[in-house]
Regions:
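Fe(II)/2-oxoglutarate oxygenase catalytic core
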Residues: 1-155, 159-178
Length: 180
């Protein structure tokens, strides 16, 4: 059975990941929030930077946009039925996320669970660094673990069929980009 979870390695190049990581390391981070816009560390414990891809003055947005558009088109070629549900367009708001050792998104969730995200068809996430001790994403319904590898992009359906959670690393920092 197909799981519709696609992996695109090297969707961001090493230099692009390093540029974005440097941006994260010099930015002001805020505690991560969950779908009710509240900090609930027992569900999601992270440091975030919310950004808007429409701000073309930010080079991080330009890097992300160029790669995301390319791979959304790849995904649509592999799964043309996705546009028959609802023409798929990206939401320009996304998060740069930093999970320090011991932090993570602990609770199983899907990506169209709130009123704000109820029309979401697909979900995406880039890994900015390789994490060898945890840091993975676990899709429960498929018993599938996706490794956090620098430059890797995941695209998957946003629905209840794709409940997932982070696997916490207790020794390494995980850096990622994900829609919100």
């Amino acid at each position: 059975m197909k799981n519709f979870i696609e992996t695109y390695d090297n969707a961001l190049q090493k230099e692009e990941c390093e540029y974005i990581i440097n941006f994260i390391n010099t930015a002001i981070l805020i505690p991560g929030v969950v779908s009710n816009q509240k900090v609930e560390v027992e569900i999601k414990d992270s440091w975030d930077i919310p950004l808007d891809m429409n701000d073309k003055s930010n080079e991080v947005n330009n890097i992300l946009f160029n790669s995301l558009v390319k791979y959304i088109e790849e995904y649509k070629k592999e799964h043309p039925q996705v546009d028959s549900i609802n023409p798929w367009r990206y939401d320009p708001i996304y998060n740069l996320q930093k999970y320090n050792p011991g932090q993570g998104y602990h609770k199983l969730h899907c990506e169209n669970i709130s009123l704000h995200t109820s029309n979401r068809v697909m979900a995406w996430m880039f890994y900015l660094n390789t994490v060898t001790d945890g840091g993975n994403t676990y899709f429960e319904n498929y018993d599938l673990t996706m490794n956090a590898i620098e430059g890797r992009l995941l695209i998957w359906p946003a629905y209840w069929t794709h409940f997932h959670k982070g696997i916490v690393s207790h020794t390494e920092t995980k850096l990622s980009l994900i829609h919100i």
